[in-house]
Amino acid sequence: MGLLSEFKAFAVKGNVVDMAVGIIIGAAFGKIVSSFVGDVIMPPIGLLIGGVDFSDLAITLKAEGDVPAVVLAYRKFIQTVLNFVIVAFAIFMGVKAINRLKREEAVAPSEPPVPSAEETLLTEIRDLLKAQQNKS
């Protein structure tokens, strides 16, 4: 098996394709969460805290001579922590739902397989032979 055919077999496996789709959706979901936190969650929190504008939260260290001032923008850190919490919670809820579905599938009793016509015929023959042996 050549290198190219091995790569093709690897690339089209279901797990690799599923993983790629998951990464793409995850990246898009991350952008949605970032916008949600920055544009929807942070402004009301700032209002509740007392009119704090989170976009301006930073600590500026003094400049020394020709060296410009260093800005520690902790607003971005707070927003990133909130992004992480929201994404982690969404993943937790998704995993919890999947686990519940797996448990329901495991609990549901499976019906016994329907015997084939050949099995049914053999069972009838066996029963007839037993009945003949019991008569003699």
From Swiss-Prot:
Q: Which InterPro entries match?
A: Mechanosensitive_channel_CS, MS_channel, MSC/AndL, MscL_channel
Its primary localisation, in coarse terms, equals membrane
Name the domain of life: Bacteria
Q: Which UniProt keywords apply?
A: Cell inner membrane, Cell membrane, Ion channel, Ion transport, Membrane, Transmembrane, Transmembrane helix, Transport
For the Cytoplasmic compartment, the record's topological domain ranges are 1-16, 94-136
Q: Which Pfam families match?
A: MscL (PF01741)
Q: Which residues lie on this side of the membrane: Extracellular?
A: 46-73
Places the protein is found: Cell inner membrane
In alphabetical order, the GO MF annotations are:
mechanosensitive monoatomic ion channel activity
Residues spanning the membrane:
17-45, 74-93
Kindly indicate whether the keyword Amino-acid biosynthesis belongs to this entry. Answer: no
What GO terms fall under cellular component here? plasma membrane
Instruction: Kindly give the membrane topology term recorded for this protein.
Output: Multi-pass membrane protein
Task: Give the record's family classification.
Answer: Belongs to the MscL family.
What does the UniProt function comment say about this protein? Channel that opens in response to stretch forces in the membrane lipid bilayer. Forms a nonselective ion channel with a conductance of about 4 nanosiemens. May participate in the regulation of osmotic pressure changes within the cell.
Quaternary structure annotation from Swiss-Prot or TrEMBL: Homopentamer.
Xref: NCBIfam families: mscL, PRK00567.1-4
Q: What is this protein called?
A: Large-conductance mechanosensitive channel
The species this protein belongs to is Pseudomonas fluorescens
Taxonomic lineage per UniProt? Bacteria, Pseudomonadati, Pseudomonadota, Gammaproteobacteria, Pseudomonadales
